[in-house]
């Protein structure tokens, strides 16, 4: 029996993963830190009101840039997830009882932080009869109620593909409905054993048919091939995905899936061009891009592509579309120049 650092028995997959040492990062996996006035104001507000955001608690490398645009992400549903994905650092265990006061608290946090755009994500709640559909819906409703000038992106699990539960979430009408596919069919079951590739695509398809702006994410470096990435992009577009983010897998610790390869900025740039050629409305592609990174900018860009104007109450988001972002592959190549070969090397 193998014991995890916190004293519990390791899962077999964790024991296998732990045999591969943590990998050394290539030179382009680093972040620029700029503390602008909006970031400083947000930081003071968060500290003063003892607020909690994923941005801080997950140590997101993009916190300075997103907060400068007054965008932030919140995790709902508790600290424990009812499923386990091999790339995700959220604890997999029996979830806590449902906290019905959480939606109001999140909405009040959004108000205190004076956000332009908020992303809601959370754990799966297979323990609940509605799998958390009310919770994901209610937090959108409360944010809209208390913050009419704040956009809301709802990044949700699949609710087992149940149409009635998805319909409840759709009817809360977030500005963007997001469900992350994450990886390609061949390795999907190994990486996300409790999810299904086709079911995730169907979730996006249902959201598109409802009339929502849709979004998904692909994580690279977990064993997929270049051809498989292209196939997944085509599948996502066919399912009705408007916005796609593409990112490098960064291993949270030794119990998680080893990194199979470091994807160069040049390949991320190629994938961005390819995604636009396929027909996506908005694309963000780079090693340190995360699915909620500069989400307001992508929403505004997607509406423009669709020939729609920003709602009057969100017209301020038009300002976020100007200029490149720090983590786009094109920006990395500008800063660091052409990348060198970077094989996956265990940290010595």
Curated annotation (Swiss-Prot):
[4Fe-4S] cluster 1 binds at residues 55, 60, 66, 292. Its EC number is 2.8.1.8. Residues 67-281 form the Radical SAM core domain. The keyword Iron-sulfur applies. Coiled coil: none annotated. Its cofactor is [4Fe-4S] cluster. [4Fe-4S] cluster 2 binds at residues 81, 85, 88. It is found in: Cytoplasm. It catalyses: [[Fe-S] cluster scaffold protein carrying a second [4Fe-4S](2+) cluster] + N(6)-octanoyl-L-lysyl-[protein] + 2 oxidized [2Fe-2S]-[ferredoxin] + 2 S-adenosyl-L-methionine + 4 H(+) = [[Fe-S] cluster scaffold protein] + N(6)-[(R)-dihydrolipoyl]-L-lysyl-[protein] + 4 Fe(3+) + 2 hydrogen sulfide + 2 5'-deoxyadenosine + 2 L-methionine + 2 reduced [2Fe-2S]-[ferredoxin]. HAMAP family: Lipoyl_synth (MF_00206). Belongs to the radical SAM superfamily. Lipoyl synthase family. This is Lipoyl synthase. It comes from Corynebacterium efficiens (strain DSM 44549 / YS-314 / AJ 12310 / JCM 11189 / NBRC 100395). The lineage of its organism: Bacteria, Bacillati, Actinomycetota, Actinomycetes, Mycobacteriales.
């Amino acid at each position: 029996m193998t014991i995890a650092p916190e004293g519990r028995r390791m899962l077999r997959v964790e024991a296998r993963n732990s045999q591969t040492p943590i990998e050394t990062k290539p030179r382009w996996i680093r972040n620029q830190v700029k503390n602008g006035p909006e970031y400083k104001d947000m930081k003071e507000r968060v500290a003063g009101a003892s607020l909690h955001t994923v941005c801080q608690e997950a140590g997101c490398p993009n916190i300075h840039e997103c907060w400068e645009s007054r965008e932030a992400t919140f995790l709902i549903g508790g600290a424990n997830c009812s499923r386990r994905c091999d790339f995700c650092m959220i604890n997999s265990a029996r979830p806590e009882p449902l906290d019905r006061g959480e939606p109001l608290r999140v909405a009040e946090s959004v108000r205190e932080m004076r956000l332009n755009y908020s992303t809601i994500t959370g754990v799966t709640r297979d323990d609940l009869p509605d799998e958390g559909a009310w919770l994901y819906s209610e937090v959108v409703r409360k944010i809209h109620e208390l913050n009419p000038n704040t956009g809301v992106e709802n990044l949700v699990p699949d609710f087992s593909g149940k149409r009635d539960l998805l319909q409840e979430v759709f009817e809360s009408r977030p500005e963007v409905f997001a469900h992350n596919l994450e990886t390609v069919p061949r390795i999907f079951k190994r990486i996300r054993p409790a999810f299904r590739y086709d079911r995730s695509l169907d979730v996006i398809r249902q959201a598109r048919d409802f009339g929502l702006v849709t979004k998904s994410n692909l994580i690279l470096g977990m064993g997929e091939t270049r051809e498989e990435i292209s196939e997944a992009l085509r599948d996502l577009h066919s399912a009705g995905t408007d916005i796609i983010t593409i990112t490098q897998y960064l291993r949270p610790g030794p119990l998680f899936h080893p990194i199979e390869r470091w994807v160069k900025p040049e390949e991320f740039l190629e994938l961005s061009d390819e995604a636009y050629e396929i027909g996506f409305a908005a694309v963000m592609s780079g090693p340190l891009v995360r699915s909620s990174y500069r989400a307001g900018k992508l929403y505004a860009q997607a509406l423009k592509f669709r020939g729609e104007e920003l709602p009057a109450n969100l017209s301020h988001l038009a300002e976020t579309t100007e200029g490149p972002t720090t983590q786009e592959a094109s920006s990395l190549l500008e800063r660091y120049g052409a990348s060198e070969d970077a094989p996956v090397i265990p940290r010595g």
